[in-house]
């Protein structure tokens, strides 16, 4: 029997400048008492905006949790128990990819609604129903498949644009693979990350990633270098986080991500996730003898 077409995505996605300080208006949809996760670096840079974001009459004082360790199953289960013990009714994760994976897993094990606030456009995980778990030594453990996508994703483009340029460029590498991996899944009659068949909407979102990168990627990088917000930067952030997130999850993954995950066991690798995915994509396209290989190589350089 043929598998059904299955799509997934966040309950609501909000993107714009200054939204971290205004997230309370959205969080009140989920509950009134938040278990808020971030690391020390995020606290040092953004604590005022974080606190301002909870100045809403419908919210109680949040429980702030600073965590700097790896996203291991033992750690997230312990934090889930803490969230329940503090009578929190939602989880909020603020930070980069690792912190958002932690927040997703905590919400999963605590069975609570989830809001994620990415502080960089370094990967396409914020919108997904997947949390990547690692061993204590930082090597890849497994994908934790969640029951649902985040209920709310809040992207403050002022914060994301201020992140180190390398992080945004790494996110471009992650998004670059989205279309080609989805295309491979369709060609092989494979399944997507929801266990269903990739449908037309998934391919449209995935192809939009590639088109956006080719149209706006270079200009957005140039603007970010100059510290300038622009329509190209806004489109790139949406591409890296939303389009690629929906595209990879509903379209499926292939060799590019398999290679990237394998590289995590090599301590000398030192690459960010999106950088490793871009390398894996080049290998995938070479093996497929894909006509886009030259264009992809030129873009990566």
Kindly give the residue locations of the regions a language model identified:
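A short, small-residue-rich loop immediately preceding and capping a beta-strand
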Residues: 83-119
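Active-site segments that bind and position negatively charged phosphate/pyrophosphate groups
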Residues: 193-301
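A glycine/threonine-rich phosphate-anchoring loop and its flanking beta-alpha core
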Residues: 11, 108-201
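Structural motif
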Residues: 12, 34-35, 89-92, 113-115, ...
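ATP/NTP phosphate-donor binding region
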Residues: 1-90
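Solvent-exposed alpha-helices and their adjacent loops that cap or buttress functional pockets
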Residues: 5-7, 28-29, 84-86, 107, ...
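Short glycine/serine/threonine-rich phosphate/pyrophosphate-binding segments
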Residues: 20, 43-47, 73, 98-105, ...
